[in-house]
Amino acid sequence: MKNRVAIIILGLALLGGCGTEAPPETVFDAVDLRADKHKQPRPRCHQYSEQRNAYFGDLHVHTSVSNDAWSFDVRVDPDGAYGYAFGDSVKLPLGDDYAAREVRIDRPLDFAGVTDHAEFFGEAELCKEQGASAPEFCQVFGSGAGRNPKLVMRITAPFQLRPKDLCGADGKLCGAAAETVWHRAVATAERWNDTTADCKRTTFVAYEYSSFRMGSNLHRNVIFRNAVVPNRPISYLDAIREWDMWRLLKEKCIDGSDLCDVLAIPHNSNISNGRMFNVTYPGANSVEEQVARAKLRMEIEPIIEIMQHKGDSECRNGLNGVLGGVDELCDFEKFENLAFTSITGSPEVDDCYAGPLSDWVPHLGPSCLDRNSYVRYALTEGLKEEARIGVNPFKFGISASTDTHNGLAGGVQERNYPGHLGNGDATERDRVRYTGEVAGNTSNGPGGLIGIWAEENTRDSLFDGMRRKEVFGTSGPRIQPRFFGGWKLPKDLCSDPAMVSKAYASGVPMGADLPGKSSASPTFLVSAAADAGSAEFPGMPLQQLQVIKGWYDDNGDHQQRVITVAGDANNGATVNLDSCAPQGEGFAQLCSVWQDPDFDAKQRAVYYLRAVENPSCRYSAWQCLELPENERPADCASAQVPKLIQERAWSSPIWYTPS
């Protein structure tokens, strides 16, 4: 490991003299790129509801504009991605044929946002324009190049790094080209956004900020309310520290224009080596500076992505400083296990170093364990931090998305999953391999969806839902969870036809704080509707609803409790692995009014809902079955490759803070 770290440090040092000058911050000033039709007041949607509807979408989508997708031979552009999201077919590569496989979504989404990696927008554009006369650096974008180490190094280096021979000494050539690519992306989103009263589809202008600083994943998807946006996206090559990105987004967008609004959604904390939710504040030494940074983070990042194709980031068993027993459902989609083996040679890794200058310790990717890599414990860590400085920097709502690199926005169906990375996993044999030698190996999955409770399917209504954190994530199915908390919720709400309106009137929805102080224990309305699915792919019934409670004890340890409040965890539901046929009964709808029997009015606490389906076949089991028995890789029989999953939905939390 020491040798690997030395190689990283040497490589960064050698690259240190290859960077260009940083651009003036004026290049990020907000500009109005709205199409003319979007500047007019729009009609109310036909399906408008004061009680709010559940809308499903994908806000983590890569197309051929992303350097890694292009290098794996994906040629689905943003137009194609939006087309796929809303029902059109697209074509994916297989070997030398870049349009060999035709795929179509099983059900159109309500909304989508293409989030191509903003890093190298300009470099890739110039390389394509210059063709054979392009500098040697451009080989990193070549067909079949995959994830080129030269590019990875540039998003790992803790300093600004662009190729001078392509971008010019001042970087202006790449900057101008990046603006061209960005404006084109904005125009595409504008073109697909439905502004009629039908409200059939909503698109968001978006991009990804892809920090892999010092070898830890610190990526964020940046989502704008409309097409009044910075003139150029703020990428890792422009803002090496995430708090610099937050500052620029606030100064240039939120404060810089009456019409610009933005939020960012971090993802893949599971492979961040504990850095995503670390409560150190490099450069902010006083409590006042730390408070300011925590407030800025919550303004820019009100939501976290808990699930995508690189696994689940909810929780993990066996972590230091986490008490409360084993949660078997935390073993779900642990992408990082294979990553640990690939990087360190073993799935068993040490705890992450968390001492001084821990954010300067280089990694080669996910290579250590830390509770600060997982959402559940970040929620509890936020309670502790609020007690210390008066601000909770981790008071976020919960979402999910796909992170497809095929342009397949919302392509989450397990039954016919075509992969996520072009020629990196173009065949069934690739997708069921459990090895780091295959880019799209079976530790990956289709990913999830974000659900938003909103009055209508418009940018403003959906964005407002994200701002107030009335959002939820699913591992793919369109489960509809509702979660309310209050001091006087009626106990018969589940049987009341006016359940939702009364819950809003007498409580708060997911994403909010329990109001005021009460000597009584809080009551929660916990409800979910199963995904009915489609005629071709029927949905699975629900098995159970669980409330997860988090708090910290007097020793500073994280405490957790998982309570099944509806359904039956022992209902006997299973799957015939010879055919993937589900067996056993479940529930189309579950509901309960639950009161916390262990409530302590002096103790900060956080609650969220997890709705769990009956077991079903994972995509890897389906694809092993579809291969002739004599052609199945040995991995099809490996215990390391999961055959069954329990799909699920997670609500945003509800918080309690003592007065």
State the predicted function of each range.
Residues 223-225:
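Long, charge-dense tracts
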Residues 19-78, 82, 89-141, 174, ...:
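C-terminal functional module detector
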Residues 2-9:
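Sec-dependent signal peptide recognition
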Residues 173-181, 197, 237-265:
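Cap/lid and interdomain-hinge subdomains that line or gate substrate/regulatory clefts
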Residues 140-167:
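Low-complexity, serine/threonine/proline-enriched polar segments
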Residues 15-17:
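C-terminal motif of bacterial Sec signal peptides marking the signal peptidase cleavage site
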